[in-house]
Design a protein with these regions (language model features):
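Short active-site neighborhood of thiol/selenol oxidoreductases, capturing the structured segment around
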Residues: 43-62
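N-terminal "domain-start" segment that seeds a small globular fold
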Residues: 19-45
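Thiol/disulfide oxidoreductase modules built on the thioredoxin-like
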Residues: 100-108, 113-158
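Alpha/beta-hydrolase fold active-site loops
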Residues: 51-52, 83, 129
Length: 161
């Protein structure tokens, strides 16, 4: 009987550890310093004091394209209240593909281009879009994999602002 209890407790610990590991990175958000299409460097470290939404996406990704209008609305609504959004494109075609898409979609928040090394720093990304919410102290507060509505995003960031 006692052995069954020990096995049960150990099983719960294993499940808890597995779930914690599956969440992706926690703690301090990995820094990046990447240029936007105008050549301005966007550095995560310099955004401390703001809630930062870091969104990994690509122009060819349908769910990514669908969530962008809501991200634009959130940015316009909350940028004066301490919200920053940084879109990190994972398009292999680089600015040649991304810049026309930014213009066509009228994206108002900063867009930069990431690479495999940055993806690795964020714990590897299994799907896009993947969004990290970084609190005012620079720590990853939340992570969301997949499409997100404006309302979903608002729920993730509002309490942190």
């Amino acid at each position: 009987m006692k052995a069954l209890r020990v096995v049960g407790v150990l099983s719960l610990i294993v499940v808890a550890v597995a779930l914690a590991c599956a969440k992706g990175p926690t703690g301090k958000a990995p820094n990046f310093a990447l240029k936007d299409p105008a050549g301005k460097v966007i550095e995560l470290e310099k955004l401390k004091g703001k809630v930062v939404v870091v969104n990994f996406w690509a122009t060819w990704c349908g769910p990514c394209r669908r969530e962008i209008p809501g991200f634009i609305e959130m940015y316009e609504q909350y940028k004066g209240k301490g919200l920053e959004i940084v879109g990190i494109s994972l398009d292999r075609g680089g600015w040649e593909v991304v810049k026309p898409y930014i213009e066509k979609s009228k994206i108002t928040y900063p867009i930069v281009i990431g690479d495999g090394a940055l993806v690795d720093k964020y714990g590897g990304i299994s799907a896009i879009p993947t969004t990290f919410v970084v609190d005012k102290k620079g720590n990853i507060a939340k992570q969301h994999v997949g499409y997100m509505t404006k309302e979903d995003l608002e729920k993730l960031v509002k309490d942190l602002l």
